[in-house]
């Protein structure tokens, strides 16, 4: 196994065979897990999480289909936000389909049950064959043409505000800690901010409210973003007004499943955020009802039994972007 510093890996970085004109992001339906493919203008690729294993290879096949649509034949960086089954479970099959140059994670597994140990051992068996990066808050992932900043990992968050950030957050006054907040691998999630010139997208994995609070209270260490990938599949234990109001997104993406994530309270908080125009969802959230789901054009998969359609976001240097729904070919520019 080679464990390299990010600086050393940057020196060794090479562009992939496919070169995108702009930043392209594919939000892949893995039924309430996560898998997001970033294709940089340089052609380098970052895959964040691999969805579930099992289900007759469902999620790796969907990842492969999105990669084919993007013209991607290899993964330069595979980032595993944490070691839960819905984020790392599909790795075995994904690794059979694509060469993976570097593996990024938060460090040791923190859950000691049998299944968690099996998943972590599976992950390390692949990571040890290549380049493994244990990323920490403040690190930069070396993808050409993008600034990919690690904001959270291994239970820690960014120590100081990013350049241009650091404004007081008035919503912090109403924050109340959740006495029932879980302590699990979710809290260890790697969270990243990707900047492409004037475009910024935030993805905090499965972080929940206390770590969101640490990133934006009493000072907003992040600043504002164009797009927010709703935390924890738009779960009720995350997506606090303290975070979402502070980052002031124009668009939110929910990587929810038909019966996982997409919680009404979280949806409403995001929906009511000043300046937000739209929420795009990977699935219609069955338990949330019409009042807490977006209109059909903004949902990639309406039926519970579906083909696993994806959403694609294309961002320009000037900060403008568009989102495309592969189910109905609907596209909207921002």
Placement of each model-derived feature along the sequence:
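Sec-dependent N-terminal signal peptides
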Residues: 3-13
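Non-globular, low-confidence helical/coil segments that flank catalytic cores
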Residues: 6, 17-334
């Amino acid at each position: 196994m080679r464990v390299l510093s990010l600086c050393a890996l940057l020196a060794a970085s090479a562009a992939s065979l496919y070169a995108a004109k702009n930043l392209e992001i594919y939000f892949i339906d893995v039924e309430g897990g996560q898998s997001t493919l970033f294709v940089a203008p340089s052609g380098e690729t970052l895959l964040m999480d691999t969805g579930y294993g099992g289900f007759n290879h469902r999620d790796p096949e969907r990842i492969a289909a999105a990669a084919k649509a993007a013209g991607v034949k290899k993964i330069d960086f595979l980032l595993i936000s944490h070691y839960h089954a819905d984020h790392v479970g599909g790795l075995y099959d994904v690794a059979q389909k694509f060469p993976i140059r570097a593996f990024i994670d938060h460090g040791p597994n923190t859950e000691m049950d049998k299944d968690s140990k099996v998943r972590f051992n599976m992950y390390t068996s692949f990571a040890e064959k290549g380049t493994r990066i244990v990323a920490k808050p403040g690190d930069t992932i070396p993808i050409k043409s993008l600034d990919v900043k690690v904001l959270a990992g291994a239970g820690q968050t960014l120590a100081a505000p990013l350049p241009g950030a650091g404004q007081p957050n008035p919503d912090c006054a109403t924050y109340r800690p959740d006495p029932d907040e879980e302590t699990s691998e979710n809290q260890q999630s790697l969270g990243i901010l990707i900047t492409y010139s004037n475009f910024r997208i935030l993805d905090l994995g499965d972080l929940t409210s206390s770590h969101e609070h640490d990133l934006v209270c009493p000072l907003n260490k992040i600043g504002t973003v164009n797009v927010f990938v709703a935390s924890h599949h738009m779960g009720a234990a995350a997506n606090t007004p303290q975070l979402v109001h502070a980052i002031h997104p124009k668009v939110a993406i929910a990587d929810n499943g038909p019966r996982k994530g997409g919680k009404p309270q979280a949806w409403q908080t995001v929906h009511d955020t000043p300046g937000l125009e739209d929420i795009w969802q990977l699935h219609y959230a069955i338990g949330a009802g019409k009042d807490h789901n977006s209109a059909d054009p903004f949902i990639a998969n309406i039926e519970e039994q579906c083909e696993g359609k994806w959403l694609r976001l294309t961002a320009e240097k000037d900060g403008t972007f568009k989102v495309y729904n592969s189910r109905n070919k609907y596209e909207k520019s921002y």
